[in-house]
Amino acid sequence: MVSSSNASSDQLSQESLVIISSSSHEGFSYGKRHPTVALNGSLNKKLRVRSGSLEELSDSEFDVSAKEEEKKSTELQDPKSIDLETQFSDVESDLDSLNERNKGADMLELTDDESVHELPGSSRDFFDENDVEEMSMELIKMYSIGLNAEGVSEFKKSSASLVLPKNTEKSTYLKSNAVRQKFMTKYDLPPVLFLDQLESRTREHISVCDAILTGKVSSLYYSMAKTVQKNSKRQVITNEELRDLNILKFTAGYFGSRRQAIVGMLILETYGEKLKRNKNPVISFWGPYDFSQYILAPEVLSYLCMDDFKLNNIEDAWDIMQTTIEFGTMVADLSPLEVYEIECEEESLRRLRLPQQYSSMSYRDDPRRKQDSNVG
């Protein structure tokens, strides 16, 4: 790095720098001068650049340069020079003026009465389980990605595999197996989907997003999203509001948050531009990414649930999705999504000396067999 000094021309007219050199690496560093002695195998030299060559600075020249840099740094850090009232003031828009600007826009209004789709009391009690909510939030943070073109392809490859702390890894497998046995017995849930199965089945039902966006079908998750928007004083949901939100209400049941995130990205690829242009206040409040992730994705997965259980109406699918969230966060989110993750799971079970019954492959078809048959 190169630092410009404000010293007078007779004191220091050229650019000065401190070079810290060692046998293993060389680099530039700002800061006060250190004594000219060996420091961790490196030697500090006072040099300046003149006509393409390096000359050593005198102590007085270096001190002038160092004092000027220290003065600049102090001025930048002086809190009196920053108007905190202006810099951190809340920008709250007038909702009436917002509605005025949106007059005449294509506003989304659902055709059914949204109030009839409130969550049953049993589901509300389930959502209050702290351990499940904490697990869900950890998984969502672990698999969340930024909104960019490269992130989409990286996420679809599932490059980030789930890694658990060693002291909790075995207990997590034990609890996951117990939850799986409970829900498989009670609900006869289908095997957790692999990535290719998930993408294929999602594309069969992704067009339901059009029906939701035009108000042709009702949506439980849109109704809940609208309630959040109505209770907020802001135009756009904040990170603080997301943290305070009971995110389990927007989790896609037995599919889990990991697979829900992938469906959300598939939806964003297809409907991202349409969501950006939509002037509906609920969509504007949540934004294209979160609206795809927390509203449209669980809605699309609810239609996969209808197929799994051969249901005739979406309301029954919503009930199943709401009551199987624990399976999603404790079983589906820990189950291999891609083929290479199966080997990781098998290695973990061997290391922990857990029998085959704790493997997710004890109830799922192994896709490696299909690959082997295709090769043969």
UniProtKB/Swiss-Prot annotation:
Keywords: Cytoplasm, Nucleus. SMART domains: RTC4. Residues 64-81 have a biased composition (Basic and acidic residues). It comes from the Eukaryota. It is found in: Cytoplasm; Nucleus. Residues 50-81 are annotated as: Disordered. One of its GO terms (cellular component) is nucleus. Pfam families: RTC4. May be involved in a process influencing telomere capping. Belongs to the RTC4 family. This is Restriction of telomere capping protein 4. It comes from Kluyveromyces lactis (strain ATCC 8585 / CBS 2359 / DSM 70799 / NBRC 1267 / NRRL Y-1140 / WM37). The gene is RTC4.
